[in-house]
Amino acid sequence: MSAFTPASEVLLRHSDDFEQSRILFAGDLQDDLPARFECAASRAHTQQFHHWQALSRQMCDNVRFSLVAQASDVADCDTLIYYWPKNKPEAQFQLMNILSLMPSGVDVFVVGENRSGVRSAEPMLADYAPLNKVDSARRCGLYHGRLEKQPQFSLESWWAEYSIDGLTIKTLPGVFSRDGLDVGSQLLLSTLTPHTKGKVLDVGCGAGVLSAALASHSPKVRLTLCDVSAPAVEASRATLAANGLEGEVFASNVFSEVKGRFDMIISNPPFHDGMQTSLDAAQTLIRGAVRHLNSGGELRIVANAFLPYPKILDETFGFHEVIAQTGRFKVYRTVMTRQAKK
């Protein structure tokens, strides 16, 4: 994190107004402004493990990664600065959670890019902290209000689920394909054959649907699942539990917290980080897989057909094959051999 996002640049236009504020930053924290902003005190809460990694280097214990904020995260903050994400249910979940912990009268600022739907903040918070737009620049909006009424927040009420092939998939706001199985994952699932064995790592596990489906017809697999998203980690744990399946699930920035080697790595890697297009996670996945695959181990990923993954696969492993495709998606497979670049 170094360059500021457009949303942060809009906030900096008002930096003099925050010099005496004790601020809690939350939402889609794409840069390190929370660590560098000049104010009386600064704390941050994030559901994204990679954002926590970046901010904790400067903020230490004043930034926390978790599914829900707690009273200790709010502490004595008198101001909330919330960065609007592209996912409206995710924003509602986070805002209702955080505002339920803050006392009436605190200042509430919401900032985000217009294309993210930040205008939705006004009707969303109308009953709790009526907002007014105070700035519009860099194709972003900045809104301000004061908390008049604390919302009620119960984590249990935010859980949702859907079924696929007899499996119960548990989901939360902010989890990829929360409302049902996406087409890409469906294509990848079609290539996973019964009686698969060995250690399988599911990177970017989302709600855990790939691992649950694999384990349902291949009971001898040993599952490890990871994701940068706290909602995804909790949803995957809940999905495994709901279907009587076992597996280790934890937060990781691709391989950052992964130990050991595996017989198969599966993934539907993201190519967005918030509103921004980013191939970083997929490149890290492909290039880093050689350090986490056993000899003869397999990497199998699904991706939009237009993304430049074949080149990276060939550079890293020496070859790749397409084992399934539609007009929009391709499933790539490659194997750990001596020619792979370790």
UniProtKB/Swiss-Prot annotation:
**Subcellular location(s) per record:** Cytoplasm
In terms of one coarse class, where is the protein primarily found? cytoplasm
Which keywords, in A-to-Z order, does the entry hold? Cytoplasm, Methyltransferase, rRNA processing, S-adenosyl-L-methionine, Transferase
Please list the coiled coil stretches.
none
Give the highest taxon in the source lineage: Bacteria
Q: One Pfam family this chain carries?
A: MTS
A single GO molecular-function term is:
nucleic acid binding
User: What EC designation does it have?
Assistant: 2.1.1.172
State the Gene3D superfamilies in the record.
Answer: Vaccinia Virus protein VP39
Report which reactions are catalysed by this protein. guanosine(1207) in 16S rRNA + S-adenosyl-L-methionine = N(2)-methylguanosine(1207) in 16S rRNA + S-adenosyl-L-homocysteine + H(+)
Specify the enzyme's EC class, one word.
transferase
Q: Report whether S-adenosyl-L-methionine shows up as a keyword of the record.
A: yes
One GO cellular component term of this record is:
cytoplasm
Signal peptide (residue range): none
Per the entry, what this protein does is:
Specifically methylates the guanine in position 1207 of 16S rRNA in the 30S particle.
* Quaternary organization: Monomer.
HAMAP family documented for this protein: 16SrRNA_methyltr_C
Which family is it part of?
Belongs to the methyltransferase superfamily. RsmC family.
| Protein name from the UniProt record | Ribosomal RNA small subunit methyltransferase C
Task: Identify the species of origin.
Answer: Salmonella paratyphi B (strain ATCC BAA-1250 / SPB7)
